[in-house]
Structures are given as structure tokens and as C-alpha cells.
Amino acid sequence: MANYFNTLNLRQQLAQLGKCRFMGRDEFADGASYLQGKKVVIVGCGAQGLNQGLNMRDSGLDISYALRKEAIAEKRASWRKATENGFKVGTYEELIPQADLVVNLTPDKQHSDVVRSVQPLMKDGAALGYSHGFNIVEVGEQIRKDITVVMVAPKCPGTEVREEYKRGFGVPTLIAVHPENDPKGEGMAIAKAWAAATGGHRAGVLESSFVAEVKSDLMGEQTILCGMLQAGSLLCFDKLVAEGTDPAYAEKLIQFGWETITEALKQGGITLMMDRLSNPAKLRAYALSEQLKEIMAPLFQKHMDDIISGEFSSGMMADWANDDKKLLTWREETGKTAFETAPQFEGKIGEQEYFDKGVLMIAMVKAGVELAFETMVDSGIIEESAYYESLHELPLIANTIARKRLYEMNVVISDTAEYGNYLFSYACVPLLKPFMAELQPGDLGSAIPEGAVDNAQLRDVNDAIRSHAIEQVGKKLRGYMKDMKRIAVAG
């Protein structure tokens, strides 16, 4: 099969990359009613599959799970999760023929096999749903022309999708209709109802395209969301230990530092994160971030180029065909790094200490977020999409590192994200080693002393931070989420 994106002409490619519209609340006035009374069958019961299903059932929809015969016979984890939560479970042959909407929430590498199994069983005029468009865009899966193909992509892990719903809210969500598969013109109605059923309409929904979702998602997860955090963790730990820091303290400063730093990012963007620093430290973090951006820009651009061209996907799919040899080797090597095997620190590190002693880490976050955003926008992706795939998701990924270091991050993210993470981090670590060798006291592991600063310089730095495009669009989107949360709680 041909990569779908590469079959489009340039005008079509740019149009799909640039498709992004923030949808109004009034567009979801009907909630999930379009799907009520219809049969929704979810294939796969992982984190997204289970939690989306729970939300959709609580929204009044008829939800069941189609699993492989062997998963049912052997009572695998997917079968246990579905049955323990009171869902009807059956084989593909038992459930798919009656389904009005089949939602494929299996891992990317299983999509082709799943779609080839369920397509012949789907009734005429049914709909097929995805939460990530890799199978359509990168694999180029051909879907029967009578089938409507839609996407609802929550911009959070499945557990977060459920927790926010239970609080009466939701998570930001992208929705799309595949232009090659909307025979009855009902794709948008299906996608809107599905998004409303998961609670996404309460946090903000972007009408996007399969292409824009895939290309921006791949770029974000490879660079700032996973690759930069992994490279930064390994580099910072080794630097601290080489300069005499207790390995246990160094490990904790990094493991929990990312989460603490990005919590400020979540609440107030790069501006608030930088405002947590003293004035001298802020100036230094800004200078370091500018150096990092200059060094890393070609690497970010290479990843974006390889994503756009399909080079990344073809390489990863070749590894799938080779039993994940590269992926499993990189995973094993990561598990043996000094950071992953360091002892745990039993003492306490105060919240402000993470900022004061993590100036370099803050610079890495700032540089990575801005570079990912800028590179996506330069490639034709709209700012709102670029924001959600860079700054917005970073605190969620940082939280996984706080749980069980890089191991947990790589377990939680998809195999696609993990593969891209390793590609980036394996290139980034040697790239930044000369930069790490030139660091000054106070950049990492110790605080920069208070001292006089040049007012004009501080003014210019503050202006530069606040005027960046990601801060402008981020302020708007975070404000919308706060407004929606207040409305949801009041309701």
C-alpha cells in the first residue's frame, strides 16, 4: 500500500496539514444523540479502549467489545478488563456485523491486521473510527467506499480521559473525517457525537484532518514530549554525577524535576515556568535555551522532514517486520543506563529547589517546546495543533517519568512514540555533549546566586518570552479550558 499523504499533490498536502478549526460549544448542543440507539463496538481494551468505552457508556451509548477468539478463550487482560466492567464481550464474527460504528483502539502496529479482519464483517454503510490516523495516513490502508471513516483523538492518556470525565469535564480532543470515506456526509456528525460521549467537547475540540493529526502527533512525541525528556534525563544525570553529586540525589532531582517544572508550564505556559526563577537565573535559562535551539534546530527539522516524507514510518514499519529488533534493543539499552539504575534518594527536595537547581532543565524544556512548535508551524501545521502536540502534553509525559523513570514513560507511550523517542534521543545525546561540557556553576545542581541584573536586558527577555507565538495561542487555549471547566463544574 502507498503512503496516503504521498499520493496527494502539494496543494492537497498543504490543505490537509493546515486544517484546524476550534469548534464552538454550540456545535455540540446535541451531545452524543447522533449515536444513541446505535451499536458501538470497540476493538481493543487497552487504556484508551477501556476508558473511552466507560465514558461513552456513561453518556448513554450502547457499547460492547470485540476481541480475538484466543483473547476470550485464554481470558487475557483485555477480556478481564471488559468483563469486570460489565461490558458485553464477543468475537469479531459475533459483534462486528451488527455494529453501526466500529472503533479501532488497538496499537498502531496491529491496525492493518485488525482492519483486514473486521472490514469484511462490517455491514454496508457502517462507520470505522480511529483515535490515531497512522494506519490511514502512513500505512495507506484502503477502506471500503461505503464505510465512513472518522477520528476522535483525545490529547491525553486514556486514564486521564476517564478521570476528567468523572470530574464533569473532559480533555482537549481532535476530530476528523477521512475525505476519501464520507459517502453519506455523516462523518462529522458521528465524530462530534463520539467526542461528546467521551467528554471532549467540555475541554475544547479542534476540527482537524487525519494528516494534520498524524504528522503533528509524530513530531511532538519524537522530539519534546519523549525524546527531549529522555535525552535531557540522561545528559543531566551524567553531568551531575561527573561533578560529584550523590547519584541518588541527582536521580531524584531529574526524575521529579521534569514534573515539577512542567506543572508551572501547564498552569501558565513558558512565561510562568520562567517566572519561577530568580532574575539572574531567568536570564541564564533564557541564554541557555537560545544556545540549545541553535544547536538542536537541524535535528528537529530532520525529524519533521522524515515524518512529512514518510521516511520515519517506512523505517519503523521495517522494524515491525523484523520483530521490533531495533526497538527492543534500544529499550534494553535504556534500562541499563546509569540514570535508570541509580539508587533512590530518601530525602526531600522542596518544590522551589527543583527550579533553583534545574536551570538547565528549564532551558531544555523551553528550547524543546519552542523548537517543536516552530518546526511544525513552518511545515504548514496550524498553531493550535502544534500547541497541543508540544506544550500541552508535556506535563502528562513528565508525570510518567515521576512514577518510574524512563521505563514508565516508555511503557505508557505507544510503540510508535517509543521508537521515535529512541531515534531522537540517540542522536541528541552526542549532539549536546560539547554543550554540556561548557556549562557554568549554577546551571545544574546548584543555585545561581542573587545579584544585580540589567533592567533593559530583563525587560527584553521578558518581552521575548511572552511574545512567542506559542505563548499567545497557549494563553487563548488554556483560557478556554478554564472557562469550560467552570461551566462543567457549575453544571
Swiss-Prot record:
Mg(2+) 2 binds at D217, E389, E393. Binds 2 magnesium ions per subunit. One of its GO terms (cellular component) is cytosol. It catalyses: (2R)-2,3-dihydroxy-3-methylbutanoate + NADP(+) = (2S)-2-acetolactate + NADPH + H(+); (2R,3R)-2,3-dihydroxy-3-methylpentanoate + NADP(+) = (S)-2-ethyl-2-hydroxy-3-oxobutanoate + NADPH + H(+). One of its GO terms (biological process) is L-valine biosynthetic process. InterPro entries: 6-PGluconate_DH-like_C_sf, 6PGD_dom2, KARI, KARI_C, KARI_N, NAD(P)-bd_dom_sf. The keyword Membrane does not apply. Its EC number is 1.1.1.86. Keywords: Amino-acid biosynthesis, Branched-chain amino acid biosynthesis, Magnesium, Metal-binding, NADP, Oxidoreductase, Repeat. It comes from the Bacteria. Pathway: Amino-acid biosynthesis; L-isoleucine biosynthesis; L-isoleucine from 2-oxobutanoate: step 2/4; Amino-acid biosynthesis; L-valine biosynthesis; L-valine from pyruvate: step 2/4. Residues 209-344, 345-484 form the KARI C-terminal knotted domain. NADP(+) binds at C45, G46, A47, Q48, R68, R76, S78, D108, K109, Q110, G158. Pfam families: KARI_C, KARI_N. Residues 15-208 form the KARI N-terminal Rossmann domain. One of its GO terms (molecular function) is ketol-acid reductoisomerase activity. Substrate binds at S414. Its cofactor is Mg(2+). Involved in the biosynthesis of branched-chain amino acids (BCAA). Catalyzes an alkyl-migration followed by a ketol-acid reduction of (S)-2-acetolactate (S2AL) to yield (R)-2,3-dihydroxy-isovalerate. In the isomerase reaction, S2AL is rearranged via a Mg-dependent methyl migration to produce 3-hydroxy-3-methyl-2-ketobutyrate (HMKB). In the reductase reaction, this 2-ketoacid undergoes a metal-dependent reduction by NADPH to yield (R)-2,3-dihydroxy-isovalerate. Belongs to the ketol-acid reductoisomerase family. This is Ketol-acid reductoisomerase (NADP(+)). It comes from Salmonella newport (strain SL254). The gene is ilvC.
